Design a protein with these regions (language model features):
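Conserved N-terminal structural module of periplasmic/extracytoplasmic solute-binding proteins
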Residues: 3, 7-9, 19-136, 140, ...
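A structural signal for short loop-to-beta-strand junctions that line the ligand-binding cleft
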Residues: 116-117, 125, 129, 153-194, ...
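Extracytoplasmic/periplasmic solute-binding protein
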Residues: 169-180, 185, 195, 212-264
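Short helix-initiation/N-cap motifs at beta->coil->alpha
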Residues: 104-113, 132, 209-215, 291-303
Length: 480
């Protein structure tokens, strides 16, 4: 791809995108795995004593031999030491002669850093997938298509083409997710406190097929009513993502990707309206509420047993697992967001994760081999077993926590809903996040305080639809 064209596409949207990325989330706090601006300059130091990983006896086919190289990674974490990636990296390093140098930045800094690097002709070779990747950053020519380097017929990608192809941009594949999470956001609860109160265990309700919207609301009511002093609250957490999970449980995503690759809005869908009505009832009844001074990532309300549920990404479960290691009286567990009892199936809000190769990368072939290694850590039995050992040492999960959490990565066992509502552009994405968060929680947002779902939607549907039409127009006209 012509470098001047890459640069023009990147710079065309860089200013507005970067400024919008600094806007407040309005979600009652911040979500450290989605909105962080924290940064460190280089890779962290791995402690082989705490998490030694050996891949010497493993043999996988991640691609043909490549020239040894040092790849540059730009993203949220050290992919050479993280428990779930370290075995893949060690195999890549030892068998393909490649190293990866990590520059770790907050997620809100990735776009700015990537834009600057591409503009200077210093593109990194790997970058995290983020909310703004599709379609925003793809439309700006910020990535390298990987069709020439990846083989969808390879065993590790079996059964995934329907998901990978959803992220095509004008007929080209840029994104091959190596991680698939059917339930990437969970409802975390203090199982020990539930037992003390005499409440039914949500995990048991889930196992029995009884975990529905109504069951969750009933459990929260009983939890709150169990405290005569009125100090217990219901649901808190990642406000917009919790709301999205409830909507997706109807089987209808807010924004879906059609078979023709175009975006389809379902903001006016009757099932989405019904989910919004349910969320507003949770808010009005006080079942979804932040405690005074609490933000969405705070763990004390769950540990102390003063909140029923925290809706949060799986990343936070390791924090609770480590607390349980230090205090064996703690029993923290989690369940998926509940089923919509009016839906024909139990639908789960699916997310994906992986790396893309930025435009201008000099080592796209090597980067593709590494992506294959990461995917094989989920499919090759030997590498998968080594990866589990690494994760357990690194994240301190109990066997029960690990087994339940990782069961949701077998996506063909579930009815997965692919929903991409935040990637239109940073401004519109934030509008959608604000609408969702303020539907489920009383966030006292200056713009939306006191407004209903319908009022917020109608005030913004024109902006949302305009952006959808813009991207669909690019696909029609051939943005290449």
């Amino acid at each position: 791809m012509n470098f001047k064209r890459i640069l023009a596409g990147v710079m065309a949207g860089a200013t507005s995108i970067s400024l919008a990325a600094c806007s407040n989330s309005g979600n009652g706090g911040f979500d450290s795995d989605t909105n962080s601006t924290a940064s460190s300059s280089e890779t962290t130091i791995d402690d082989e004593i705490d998490n030694p990983v050996s891949v010497g006896d493993i043999s996988i086919d991640a691609g043909e031999d490549v020239e040894p190289a040092e790849l540059e990674y730009l993203g949220n974490y050290d992919i050479t030491t993280a428990g779930d990636v370290k075995p893949a990296y060690k195999y890549f390093s030892e068998n393909y002669g490649c190293k990866i140098k990590c520059t770790i930045v907050g997620s809100l800094q990735i776009l700015e850093k990537l834009t600057t690097a591409i503009s200077a002709g210093e593109s990194p070779d790997l970058v995290d997938y983020s909310d703004s990747t599709f379609p925003l950053m793809m439309s700006k020519n910020m990535y390298t298509p990987l069709d020439d380097y990846m083989d969808l017929s390879a065993p590790q990608w079996s059964g995934l083409d329907q998901y990978i192809n959803k992220y095509k941009w004008n007929g080209k594949n840029y994104y091959y997710p190596w991680a698939y999470n059917v339930s990437s956001y969970f409802l975390i609860y203090n199982r020990g406190v539930f037992e003390q109160i005499g409440l039914e265990d949500p995990k048991e309700l889930y196992d029995e097929g009884k975990w529905t919207w109504e069951a969750m609301a009933d459990v929260i009511r009983k939890f709150i009513d169990s405290d005569t002093d009125g100090n217990r609250t219901g649901l808190y957490g990642a406000s917009e993502y919790s709301a999205q999970a409830i909507i997706d449980s109807t089987g209808v995503p807010l924004i879906e990707i059609g078979e023709d690759g175009k975006l389809v809005s379902n903001f006016n869908n009757a099932s989405v309206d019904r989910a919004a009505t349910f969320m507003q009832s949770l808010k009005s009844e006080g079942l979804a509420k932040f405690q005074e001074g609490v933000i969405n990532v705070d763990e004390d309300p769950i540990v102390s047993g003063t909140a029923a549920f925290q809706g949060m990404g799986e990343w936070i479960i390791t924090n609770y697992a480590k607390k349980m290691k230090k205090d064996d009286s703690l029993d923290i567990f989690f369940v998926p967001f509940p089923r919509d009892s009016q839906a024909d199936e139990y639908y789960y809000s699916m997310t994906t994760f992986g790396y893309l190769v930025p435009a201008g990368s000099k080592f796209a072939k090597q980067a593709s081999v590494f992506i294959n290694c990461c995917r094989l850590s989920n499919t090759d039995e030997d590498l998968k077993a080594t990866t589990k050992e690494s994760i357990m040492r690194n994240k301190k999960y109990t066997d029960e926590q690990y087994d339940f959490m990782y069961s949701f990565k077998e996506i063909n066992n579930f009815h997965a809903v692919v929903d991409e509502p935040y990637g239109l552009d940073e401004t519109t994405g934030q509008i959608i996040k604000d609408i969702l968060g303020n539907t489920l929680f009383d966030l006292q947002n200056e713009t939306y305080a006191g407004q209903s779902w319908t009022q917020m939607r109608e005030a913004n549907i024109g902006t949302i639809n305009k952006q959808i039409e813009y991207y669909n127009g690019l696909i029609t006209s051939g943005n290449s």
